[in-house]
Structure formats: C-alpha cells, structure tokens
C-alpha cells in the first residue's frame, strides 16, 4: 500500500463555528513524506500537523505557533484518517476550519471531488505495541494492540435524550462514510448562550449542530442515528488520533473521552518507542488494515 494524496486542488467555503464568518478551505496535493501541512494564507503561517503543534484542546483541537492558530480541525481530520491520506496541504483564510454541517460528510465529499492519488512511497502507519491509557476520574481513553483499527466509545449524560450510549466501530473507509461521517456535533442551548455572550460559537446554528434544551432536541428534523451522539464521539476520536500524522493500528476505547484526553493519549503513545512501531503496511503481520481502505 502506497502513501496517498489528492489528484487535484479543490476548495469550499463554509462558516466558522466561533467567529461566524465565511472561511475558505482549499486542499492541495503534496509529495510523498511531506505529511499533513496546514497553512493560513491570511497571515502566511504554516503548521505541520503533529502533537507538538497542538496548543489547546478545551473545546476543540487547536494547532498553532507564535504567529497564530487554526481551530476545530478534528472533523476534517477524521475524513483524512478515513481516506488514508498521508500528504496534504490544507489552506484556510482564517483562524478556524469551516464547520459545514457539524459532521465530516462535507469533507468526505470534498475529498471525493479531489480524487485520491497513490504516490511512489510505502504508506507508514503507527502500530500500537503495548497498552497506553490516560484517565481523569471515571473518564478514560486507551489504545491497545490490535490487528485492525477499532473504536469503542461510551458516553453518559444526565439528559433524557442522550443518557447512556455507545458505538463500536470496526474501521473501514466505506463503514466510516455509512456509519460515522454524518454524525453531527452537539451542544446545549444554555452553554451556547453563554459562549455567544463571550463572542464564541457565533456561527453555531441548528444547521451545523444538534441543539438540546433541558428536555429535548431542538432540531426539527431529529437525529440521523439513534446513537448519533456516541457516533460523533468516535468521529472526534478518529480526527484526534490523526494528529499523530499517521493512521493508527490499534483498538481505541473510551468512556466520556474528550479532545484533551485524546491529545494526552497520542502524546503518551509517542513518548516511548516501546509503545509503538512506525511500519509500512507491507511490514505488518496482518493484511486486515490494508483491506479496510479498499
């Protein structure tokens, strides 16, 4: 299996979640071993994707440096993970990614439009060699050795619509598009009102998120899946794992995980070479992972 980029440049315009202003996103091909590189053309700032580029994880995954930042990259990166893309230039003209409909499906469609191109270098993946875990009280995230990429996410909210939910997802590109990509982010009306009073979440609407009051969903169309909330948490986790710069071969498990815990997990995984190996797909003992991108 070879490294991947896109065949041609593509672009789209969407609203930024926090500023509520239009953001232009352009994707450009890159050569083998270039990695995923974000670029803010409004301030001529380049940020190679890696855990060392992460500067904030409180409300979203944010990368940056001394010149500036780019927020809410996780929904886009989940699509990058799902399509097995290794090398890509991601150009935006503001400090956040467009939120689109609050899921990853618009980014999947954009990658479909661009087309996938295989490059003449072997694809490298991170293979988990021993269990790594991060906890915060009852909350946890962990990665375990596995012959395939799996995501098992459980959540519990004191809300009549959400309650306890789970999603177990055996990764494949087609499965992601069918089962995960359309799951939207969600928020509570009282929290959104507070954030907007702080000039945040100014772009949040029922067109790009599931809104909830204390008792019900506010979106007239309802949910896309019975467990859409848990599915979106898997989507987020996939995007956060992609911050490592590579697809990860391992079993991800979580209860009430967050962007912060996910970031701590990838950082802990990569902090000790005994935790993982960086291998070409051909060096893997299992062919299951390669088939998942078919």
Identify the function of each model-found stretch.
Residues 1-86, 91-294:
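C-terminal regulatory domains involved in ligand/effector binding and gene-expression control
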């Amino acid at each position: 299996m070879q490294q991947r980029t896109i065949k041609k440049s593509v672009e789209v315009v969407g609203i930024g979640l926090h500023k509520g202003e239009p953001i232009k996103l352009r994707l450009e091909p890159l050569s083998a071993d270039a990695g995923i590189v974000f670029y803010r053309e409004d301030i001529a700032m380049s940020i190679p994707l890696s855990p060392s580029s992460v500067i904030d994880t409180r409300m979203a995954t944010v990368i940056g440096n001394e010149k500036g930042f780019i927020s809410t990259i996780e929904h886009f990166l989940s699509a990058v993970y799902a399509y097995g893309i290794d090398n890509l230039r991601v150009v935006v003209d503001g400090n956040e990614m467009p939120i689109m409909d609050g899921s990853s499906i618009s980014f999947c469609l954009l990658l479909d439009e661009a087309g996938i191109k295989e490059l003449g270098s072997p694809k490298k993946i991170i293979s988990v060699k021993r269990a790594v875990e991060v906890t915060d009280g009852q909350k946890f995230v962990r990665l375990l050795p596995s012959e395939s990429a799996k995501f098992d996410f459980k959540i519990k909210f004191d809300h009549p619509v959400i309650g306890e939910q789970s999603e177990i997802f055996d990764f494949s590109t087609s499965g992601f598009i069918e089962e995960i990509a359309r799951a939207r982010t969600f928020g509570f009306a009282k929290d959104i009102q507070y954030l907007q009073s702080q000039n945040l979440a100014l772009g949040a609407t029922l067109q790009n998120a599931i809104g909830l009051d204390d008792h019900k969903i506010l979106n007239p169309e309802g949910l896309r899946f019975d467990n859409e909330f848990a599915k979106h948490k898997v989507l987020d986790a996939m995007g956060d794992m992609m911050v490592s710069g590579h697809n990860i071969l391992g079993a991800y498990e979580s209860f009430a995980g967050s962007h912060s815990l996910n970031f701590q997990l990838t950082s802990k995984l990569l902090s000790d070479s005994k935790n993982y190996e960086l291998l070409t797909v051909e060096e893997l003992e299992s062919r299951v992972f390669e088939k998942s991108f078919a």
